[in-house]
Amino acid sequence: MAVTGPEIERLIALLSKLPGLGPRSARRAVLQLIKKKETLLGPLAAAMTDAMAKARICSACGNVDTQDPCAICADELRDPHILCIVEEVGDLWALERAGAHKGRYHVLGGVLSALDGVGPDDLNIGRLVERLTGGEVREVVLAMNATVDGQTTAHYITDRISGLGISVSRLAHGVPVGGELDYLDDGTLAAAMKSRRPF
């Protein structure tokens, strides 16, 4: 039984489809939005309308921006010789927040997964190979998550580009900054030992 009008129920149902928001969290979010109708709900609705009208997928790298090519691909100060390959746009944004990469990116749009039926043709791998055969890229940084599917995808890409004469590196795996050894899982500790370097 609905306890409120259909418009509000629809908003709750739509919000609950977002990652990390179930029906209960969506209900709380909607109640907060309605309480702050003028200062939050109205501006949010306007921002969503603007984003819907202006958001674009970059035809070069797969990033989300309001321009195509995106601001990163259009930035002439970026090193065009280093290409960082990520699974999703959120991974690209995380690396940008960290200020850790000064080259360009390529978003795959997921990972290879036999269980989920995701193969190479379902990802942005064909476009990646096109970019790499252009001759400008000298190094590829594989920034996949440290999951079985992430590592499978990294190995697949390495095999696909092996004859192009491009150096391939991957992100280090191991102890996070501020991490305590006693709280880390065995796999992380093993990866940290294998990835150790001189101090």
Curated annotation (Swiss-Prot):
Disulfide bonds: none annotated. PROSITE patterns: RECR, TOPRIM. A zinc finger (C4-type) spans 58-73. One of its GO terms (biological process) is DNA recombination. Residues 81-176 form the Toprim domain. Keywords: DNA damage, DNA recombination, DNA repair, Metal-binding, Zinc, Zinc-finger. SUPFAM superfamilies: Recombination protein RecR. InterPro entries: DNA_Rcmb_RecR, Rcmb_RecR, Rcmb_RecR_Znf, TOPRIM_dom, TOPRIM_RecR. GO terms for molecular function: DNA binding; zinc ion binding. SMART domains: TOPRIM. May play a role in DNA repair. It seems to be involved in an RecBC-independent recombinational process of DNA repair. It may act with RecF and RecO. Belongs to the RecR family. This is Recombination protein RecR. The gene is recR.
